[in-house]
Amino acid sequence: MKSGSARIRLEWKPQKNLSFGLMSSFDRSVQGGYPYAVCDSVTHKPGEVDYNDYSFYKRTLSTTGFSADYQGTGYSINSRTAFQYLSDHQGIDQDFSPRSIYFARQDMKQKMFSEELNIKSTTPGRYKWLFGAFGFWQGIDNTVTLDYFTKDYATRKLYDTPAYGVAFYHQSTIDDLLTRGLSLTFGIRY
């Protein structure tokens, strides 16, 4: 197995009440894989692992996030933005024999973007509030190929799976309700 990763984090505070952050990570992994074998239907014991084609798994993952925070008088505004990229490749000798019969490959690419923005009270009073919004988009492109070597034939299936969503939310809290230390919190999300 060969793998490596790198990470970086930068923070900047141009003013007392304003700060920015950037975080990024990168991971790469390359490995052999999948020691499958035929299982005897009578004894239920696995046979010998016997491949003639190299099975593998390769993954690249990159994640980047950006944050911005502003502290106003009696309130704060926070923003979190993220992007993730995944590239995933698998190859499996699926005939479990020394002959070249079947070989499966799966290639997947995934991209995801998200943003969250909120504003909340920072006053020392009994009442505290928070308003926010969140949104995301994710796209997954998956290709599965099965090679039939004995027939010089291959099947290929393509899957495109987008997903997205938006949410809005609010939370109110009243501290020291009826007695010291008792709080009531109400929240709503759409």
For each predicted feature, which ranges?
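Transmembrane beta-barrel wall of Gram-negative outer-membrane proteins
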Residues: 1-31, 59-66, 115, 121-128, ...
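Flexible loop and strand-edge segments within Gram-negative outer membrane beta-barrel domains
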Residues: 19, 23-61, 88-93, 99-108, ...
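Membrane-embedded beta-barrel scaffold of Gram-negative outer-membrane proteins
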Residues: 67-95
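Short amphipathic alpha-helical "recognition" segments used for binding
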Residues: 78, 98, 119-120, 175
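Gly/His-enriched, cation/cofactor- and phosphate-binding structural elements
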Residues: 110-113
